[in-house]
């Protein structure tokens, strides 16, 4: 089954073959898998699809190719606004994700010097232990297994340490200091 995506020892996130090909920046393999019927709309445990993996990897050629094949409404701003309404995002957070800067710098920090956020259109829905959340962060300096998440339940930013399965609140968006 080309779209097999059950968690196992090799791929615990329940990703598909085409998602893994995108993760490894293998455009010829992505094309071949799609020609064989791979479904690029299947998200893994953390909400990643081949397109979002290409965005994370800054692989514009692959992202453009996959975007053209995804449902058009997934890349329509009005549809994204409608889709994210249940998450009760603060207007300031929405504006920030639309206008940036998406790279947050922490020069005074020793271990984490930066974090890069998704643009508004690329924010990902995900579920963690039956909680509906939004994944806001593409990547973070030195920590590949952390996610920055938005919880609509308490309207706070949370972080998830995937490796240790630790899920902790950080702050309300208004309490985050950032320069615009």
Regions found by a protein language model. Name each.
Residues 5-17, 43-49:
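Ankyrin-repeat boundary/"N-cap" motif
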Residues 28-29, 61-62:
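Conserved ankyrin/ankyrin-like repeat signature
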Residues 38, 70-71:
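Ankyrin-repeat C-terminal turn/loop position
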Residues 84-165:
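Non-catalytic interaction/regulatory modules that flank or connect domains
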Residues 179-180:
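Conserved small/polar residues in nucleotide/adenosyl-binding loops
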């Amino acid at each position: 089954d080309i779209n097999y995506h059950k968690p196992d020892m090799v791929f615990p996130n329940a990703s598909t073959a085409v998602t893994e090909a995108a993760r490894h920046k293998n455009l010829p393999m992505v094309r071949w898998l799609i020609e064989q019927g791979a479904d690029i709309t299947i998200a893994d445990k953390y909400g990643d699809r081949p397109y979002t993996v290409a965005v994370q990897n800054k692989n514009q050629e692959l992202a453009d190719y996959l975007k053209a094949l995804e449902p058009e409404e997934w890349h329509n701003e009005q549809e994204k606004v409608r889709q994210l309404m249940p998450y009760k995002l603060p207007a300031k957070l929405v504006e920030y994700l639309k206008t940036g800067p998406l790279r947050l710098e922490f020069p005074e920090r020793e271990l984490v010097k930066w974090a890069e956020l998704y643009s508004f259109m690329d924010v990902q829905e995900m579920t963690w232990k039956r909680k509906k959340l939004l994944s806001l962060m593409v990547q973070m300096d030195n920590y590949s297994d952390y996610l920055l998440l938005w919880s609509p339940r308490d309207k706070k930013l949370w972080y998830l340490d995937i490796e240790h399965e630790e899920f902790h609140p950080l702050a309300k968006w208004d309490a985050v200091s950032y320069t615009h």
